[in-house]
Amino acid sequence: MATPQSIFIFAICILMITELILASKSYYDILGVPKSASERQIKKAFHKLAMKYHPDKNKSPDAEAKFREIAEAYETLSDANRRKEYDTLGHSAFTSGKGQRGSGSSFEQSFNFNFDDLFKDFGFFGQNQNTGSKKRFENHFQTRQDGGSSRQRHHFQEFSFGGGLFDDMFEDMEKMFSFSGFDSTNQHTVQTENRFHGSSKHCRTVTQRRGNMVTTYTDCSGQ
């Protein structure tokens, strides 16, 4: 039979747990967006904060903890089902045994977004900015040869997201990775074209713009 003292201690524990849950900072506050924020607003807010607090760029002692907090908030709010559950139950939706994830190590296991690879691919922090990063970047956009043509993309002369450095990085990445190559039907404005002749080939250097991306390639045809 429970004693009055044990009941009192149990009640205190419940009260403390409740206060901790209520005191937890809202995921919306962490990202600095309103509860009515759109998916795009959440994505842009996360991008901005992730750039600011990524441990490779921010050397302050609490940067890593802040970055993980931001990542956890984004993981929840960027998923429609998790966001709906969070809006209904708050943090308790993920701290209880029945939640989709617990705290600490559970979060580490469920959050699989590789930020290091993302930022290194763009050479944002000045590391692997030359050969290694360039090869990985170009591999993302390696295109298949057109049937019967000797056209090859030799290098990317310029890459720009527009609207400020990496302003809409995540949105642009989604667009870029949604196609496997620059087919002729998708080519738009030809910016420049330089022709030159070899002993057996007629070649031209073509610079094209597709949306916010500019690519340069050499088109050679035998004579």
UniProtKB/Swiss-Prot annotation:
GO cellular component, one term: extracellular exosome
Tissue-wise expression: Widely expressed. Expressed at highest level in the liver, placenta and kidney.
Endpoints of the signal sequence: 1-23
Compartments where located: Endoplasmic reticulum lumen
Gene Ontology MF terms: Hsp70 protein binding; misfolded protein binding; protein-folding chaperone binding
Annotated Gene3D superfamilies: DnaJ domain
Gene Ontology biological process: B cell differentiation; ERAD pathway; negative regulation of IRE1-mediated unfolded protein response; positive regulation of immunoglobulin production; response to endoplasmic reticulum stress; response to unfolded protein
A Pfam family annotated for this UniProt entry: DnaJ
Source organism superkingdom: Eukaryota
PROSITE patterns: DNAJ_1 (PS00636), DNAJ_2 (PS50076)
Annotated region (Divergent targeting domain), positions in chain: 91-223
UniProt KW Phosphoprotein keyword: yes
InterPro entries named among the record's database cross-references: DnaJ_domain, DnaJ_domain_CS, Hsp70_co-chaperone_J-domain, J_dom_sf
Keyword annotations of the record: Chaperone, Endoplasmic reticulum, Phosphoprotein, Signal, Unfolded protein response
Annotated J domain residues: 26-90
SUPFAM superfamilies, alphabetized: Chaperone J-domain
Residue numbers of Phosphoserine PTMs: 133
Function: Co-chaperone for Hsp70 protein HSPA5/BiP that acts as a key repressor of the ERN1/IRE1-mediated unfolded protein response (UPR). J domain-containing co-chaperones stimulate the ATPase activity of Hsp70 proteins and are required for efficient substrate recognition by Hsp70 proteins. In the unstressed endoplasmic reticulum, interacts with the luminal region of ERN1/IRE1 and selectively recruits HSPA5/BiP: HSPA5/BiP disrupts the dimerization of the active ERN1/IRE1 luminal region, thereby inactivating ERN1/IRE1.
Record text on subunit structure and interactions: Interacts with HSPA5/BiP; interaction is direct. Interacts with ERN1/IRE1 (via the luminal region). Interacts with DERL1.
PANTHER family: DNAJ HOMOLOG SUBFAMILY B MEMBER 9 (PTHR44360:SF1)
Domain writeup: The J domain stimulates the ATPase activity of HSPA5/BiP, while the divergent targeting domain is required for efficient substrate recognition by HSPA5/BiP. The divergent targeting domain specifically recognizes and binds to aggregation-prone sequences.
Protein name: DnaJ homolog subfamily B member 9
Organism whose genome encodes this protein: Homo sapiens (Human)
Taxonomic lineage: Eukaryota, Metazoa, Chordata, Craniata, Vertebrata
